[in-house]
Amino acid sequence: MIDPIDGTMNFVKEKENFASMIAIYKQGKPYMAYIYDVMKDRLVWGGPALGAVYCNQTQLPAPKQHALKDGLVAISCPMVLANYRNVVEVIKASSGCRMVGSAGIEFINLILGKHCAYLSYLRPWDFLPGKILGETLGLSVKTIDDEKVDVVSSSVVLVATKSAHTEIIELVNR
């Protein structure tokens, strides 16, 4: 699965905060993924085939398992404006909310430990590379209903540290 310009509006309007992404599945199983932050010349890559994730040539550790109160969350603006599934309470319980407008860049922020959660309505080409990389590093990747993500369907996807995941699922199901 390829997303050549993830964050198209950012590419057009800002000339930054966009990424190119590739997810490779082999015999129906996640194999490798690549997210390239074009403007920062930063390639995050790896997957189950390697059992590791790298940023350029540096192997990355698993992100710290920050609780929701100790981390930043990224939640899509339409979800916040509609308070979809009580997401405003998620924001209040966190250290703050950020939204870049590119799933690839949001996944990089999670993988590098800058955020503890990302919640957005995503299409497969938006989430598959981040799913492969995130799960390789021990992040939780589920639907907002705490179900397995269907890799061929669009859905509201929650990617988070395991601690933040548990707290967010409780808040969005109140």
Question: Which residues does each predicted region cover?
Answer:
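Flexible, acidic active-site loops/lids enriched in D/E/S/T/G that coordinate Mg2+ and/or position polar
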Residues: 1-27, 34
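Proline- and acidic/polar-enriched loop/turn elements at helix boundaries
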Residues: 7, 36, 102, 122, ...
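Acidic beta-strand-loop-alpha-helix segment within the catalytic core
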Residues: 21-108, 154-174
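Acidic active-site catalytic centers that drive phospho-/nucleotidyl reactions
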Residues: 3-6, 37, 106, 116, ...
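Buried hydrophobic positions in well-ordered alpha/beta secondary-structure cores of metabolic enzymes
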Residues: 7-8, 73, 110, 134
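Oxyanion/phosphate-interacting regions
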Residues: 88-91, 108-174
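Residue-level preference for nonpolar/small residues embedded in alpha-helices
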Residues: 16, 82-83, 126
